[in-house]
Swiss-Prot record:
This is UDP-N-acetylglucosamine--N-acetylmuramyl-(pentapeptide) pyrophosphoryl-undecaprenol N-acetylglucosamine transferase. GO terms for molecular function: UDP-N-acetyl-D-glucosamine:N-acetylmuramoyl-L-alanyl-D-glutamyl-meso-2,6-diaminopimelyl-D-alanyl-D-alanine-diphosphoundecaprenol 4-beta-N-acetylglucosaminlytransferase activity; undecaprenyldiphospho-muramoylpentapeptide beta-N-acetylglucosaminyltransferase activity. InterPro entries: GlcNAc_MurG, Glyco_trans_28_C, GlycoTrans_28_N. It holds the Pfam family Glyco_tran_28_C. Pathway: Cell wall biogenesis; peptidoglycan biosynthesis. UDP-N-acetyl-alpha-D-glucosamine binds at residues 10-12, 124, 196, 300. It is a peripheral membrane protein. One of its GO terms (biological process) is cell wall organization. It is an enzyme of class 2 (transferase). Belongs to the glycosyltransferase 28 family. MurG subfamily.
Length: 367
């Protein structure tokens, strides 16, 4: 079985692809994988480090405004299309799957023109411009949220599978996480995630409320500040938080295994990226979501809205974020066992614990 996988730019496209690759290897004794990305995206480092064959093509993002960049886009698209044709001809895949990002455009188009079966996966409720276009040609379009079907009305065939990243969470054993993170079993755990680089507004708010949270509530806090803010936050926190409470505050610039922390948390405060939501629902962890306003199509707000409407999350907006509202939201959830239970049940109802398996079944059916 030979599978060509493409998707890149950000972890939100790469990690779902890796989840599918891992499941394919579990299901098939012999599977040959080629991952096609770009030399500028995160995939050019992540994929080879996983021992997966990698090839890069030329691609450029499409500008929505009419300008000279669109000429360059067309030039690079045609170049990428030719490069994709050569790669596909040499590799001869049985099926091609794309998980989003501009690199999917020329790769899936070339595969489609060469009559090779193609599958597309969309992680967000609102599809990216590339995936929306490609859904017209892909044999199957797999979506993480059923609501995505409203935005991909011209898709040939669309099916809700969930995000394959979720299956990697449900299949793991997290029994030793509490000990590894040095957490107490007699306290509720609040996980605050500001992103890999950090989010200024979230961090500014958290710095001011953590001393009150940790002194008033029987909780322990894991706070992932982001690399850009760690040193300044650490110095301020040590100044504001009483020494007697500091053992209940775990500060990290970055956590390499964030799903492990999510799995042992009682409540998570985070952005609303697609991968994060897949991890939250897979771990059945309630959340307070603060969508980033700086993303294309405002997709984090729409993602968060789905969880909020189904009772799995409380949604706050960054532009109206204030300290007392955050404290009130945390208290109303983490100090109420009934609310926690209801939110946990809601996350379970919208999780897709076998997403990677379902996608692999589709890939296998096309061969």
């Amino acid at each position: 079985m030979k599978v060509l996988v493409t998707g890149g730019g950000t972890g939100g496209h790469i990690y779902p692809a890796l989840a599918v690759i891992n499941e394919l290897k579990e299901r098939n004794q012999i599977v040959d994988i080629l991952y096609v990305g770009t030399s500028k995206g995160m995939e050019q480092e992540i994929i080879p480090n996983r021992g997966i064959d990698f090839a890069a093509i030329t691609v450029r993002g499409l500008q929505r405004k009419i300008n000279l960049e669109q000429v360059y886009f067309l030039r690079d698209f045609l170049k990428g299309l030719y490069q994709s044709y050569r790669l596909i001809k040499n590799f001869t895949p049985d099926v091609v799957i794309g998980t989003g990002g501009y690199v999917c455009g020329p790769v899936l188009m070339a595969a489609s023109l060469m009559k090779i079966p193609t599958v597309l996966h969309e992680q967000n409720v609102i599809p990216g411009i590339t995936n929306k276009f490609l859904s017209r040609f892909a044999d199957y379009t797999c979506v993480s949220f059923p609501e995505s079907k409203n935005y991909m009305t011209k898709a040939k065939k669309i099916i809700t599978t969930g995000n394959p990243r979720a299956q990697e969470i449900t299949s793991r054993d997290f029994s030793s996480v509490n000990k590894h993170l040095n957490l107490r079993s007699d306290l509720k755990t609040l996980l605050i995630v500001s992103g890999s680089r950090g989010a200024q507004k979230i961090n500014e708010t958290m710095i001011n409320i953590i001393p009150e949270l940790i002194s008033k509530f029987p909780i322990q806090i894991i706070y992932v500040t982001g690399n850009n803010y760690y040193e300044s936050i650490r110095s301020q926190i040590l100044e504001y938080v009483d020494n007697s409470y500091q053992d209940r505050l775990k500060l990290h610039a970055y956590l390499s295994d964030l799903p492990a922390a999510i799995s042992c948390a009682d409540l998570v405060i985070s952005r609303a990226g697609a991968t994060t939501l897949a991890e939250l629902t897979a771990a059945e962890t309630p959340s307070i979501l603060i969508p980033s306003p700086n993303v294309t199509n405002d997709h984090q707000r729409v993602n968060a809205k789905i969880l909020g409407e189904r009772g799995a999350a409380k949604v706050l907006t960054e532009d109206s974020l204030n300290e007392q509202e955050v404290i009130k939201s945390i208290s109303s959830i983490i100090n109420d066992e009934e609310v926690l239970f209801d939110m946990q049940r809601a996350t379970k109802e919208i999780s897709y614990p076998t997403a990677a398996t379902e996608i692999c079944k589709i890939l296998e059916s096309l061969i």
